[in-house]
UniProtKB/Swiss-Prot annotation:
It is an enzyme of class 2 (transferase). SUPFAM superfamilies: Aldolase. This is Probable transaldolase. HAMAP family: Transaldolase_3b (MF_00494). The gene is tal. It comes from Novosphingobium aromaticivorans (strain ATCC 700278 / DSM 12444 / CCUG 56034 / CIP 105152 / NBRC 16084 / F199). Pfam families: TAL_FSA.
Length: 217
């Protein structure tokens, strides 16, 4: 399973990229606003920090407007992935862009039927929002299971990119189900490294090692 980080904070991205475990980045207008930088410039900077896909979202709502914005965004770097909303015009844009060889991430997916349409439109990635689904009284992971089943039934190549991840359980369940990618905030990804017993184990080993009076270097 691939790990993307959901942020436009270049310092956080660089920190995670240094682990060698980061496969890509997702951004959205809200994250760009939080970064407080020029959209084009920060996207270019992010594309230089990772080799994998960097999702940059259009803000136009009509097909023609989306295509114009996508033309600007995909010139930033070869690893830019155009992010479009799951609407009629969004899927028209997806079909056109993927037909030209451009990666497309279809976002704001909340039903398996929507995911089916995105796959038929040739989406590179589909982004179902599990956290927001949970917030509205549904089980977000059930949505991922349904999409996985449908995509496997028809051998769709669209990758399931689980979004709106709130905690480590979402990551674990995504892996169990067989999602292709997860995207999570930096804090959630960093939290995966941590376990209280790991910390206690290190403390114990170091205490015992200190008693030997030895050094390795």
């Amino acid at each position: 399973m691939k790990f993307f980080v959901d942020t436009a904070d270049t310092a956080e991205i660089a920190d995670l990229a240094a682990t060698g475990l980061l496969d890509g980045v997702t951004t959205n207008p809200t994250l760009i606003a939080k970064a407080g930088k020029d959209f084009i410039e920060v996207t270019k900077e992010i594309c230089g920090l990772v080799d994998g896909p960097v999702s940059a979202e259009v803000v136009a709502l009509d097909h023609e407007g989306m295509m114009r914005e996508a033309e600007v965004l995909r010139k930033i770097a070869d690893n830019v992935c155009i992010k479009v909303p799951l609407t009629v015009d969004g899927l028209k844009t997806c079909k056109a862009l993927t037909g030209e060889g451009t990666m497309v991430n279809v976002t704001l997916c909340f039903s398996a039927n929507q995911a089916l349409l995105a796959a038929k439109a040739g989406a590179t990635f589909i982004s179902p929002f599990v956290g927001r689904h949970d917030d509205n009284g549904f089980d977000g992971m059930d949505l991922i299971r349904d999409i996985r089943l449908i995509y496997d039934n028809y051998a769709f190549e669209t990758q399931i990119l689980v979004a709106s991840i709130r905690h480590g359980v979402h990551v674990l369940e995504s892996a169990r189900i067989g999602a292709d990618v997860i995207t999570a905030p930096p804090a959630v990804i960093k939290g995966l490294f941590k376990h209280v017993l790991t910390d206690k184990g290190i403390e114990g080993f170091l205490a015992d090692w200190a008693k030997t009076g030895q050094k390795i270097v």
